């Protein structure tokens, strides 16, 4: 987390958010574990979600939420909302005030692309193309039919 001092960027070490993400993101994770989870979720799922636990109007903790248990949508005002299924099975619809959402490359501006699913489609297409080419050239590139 940085702030601009003229044309220079300086670490914002005095900011509450800097302390939160750099020293104590929540009660059970070190910053290293938290950021490893962020990167892992982005690489495997394309999205990372954290529930913002607030105290006195400030974010006090960031609790990771399984990307598979969150469904992002746009409400009638075109604002992102998140339908979350919690570990106890309860569900709730939360706003951006309550959820921190980090996404990778997106096609709709709302949901990050799942890199594995996207790669799977590309690999499947390449395999189908290879199979078609192999069949075509095994026949001397002569088409049958007419």
Predicted regions and their residues:
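Structured, contiguous alpha/beta core segments that scaffold functional sites
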Residues: 1-146
């Amino acid at each position: 987390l940085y702030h601009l001092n003229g044309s220079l960027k300086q670490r914002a070490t005095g900011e509450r958010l800097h302390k939160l993400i750099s020293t104590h993101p929540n009660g059970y994770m070190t910053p290293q574990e938290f950021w490893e989870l962020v990167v892992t979720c982005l690489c495997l799922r394309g999205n990372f979600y954290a529930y913002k636990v607030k105290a006195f109007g400030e974010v006090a903790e960031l609790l990771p939420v399984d990307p598979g248990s969150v469904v992002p949508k746009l409400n009638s005002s075109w604002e992102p909302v998140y339908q979350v299924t919690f570990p106890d099975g309860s569900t709730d619809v939360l706003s951006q005030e309550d959820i921190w959402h980090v996404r990778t490359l997106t096609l709709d501006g709302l949901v990050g692309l799942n890199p594995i699913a996207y790669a799977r489609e590309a690999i499947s297409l390449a395999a189908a193309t290879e199979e078609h080419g192999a069949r075509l050239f095994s026949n001397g590139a002569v088409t049958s039919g007419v």
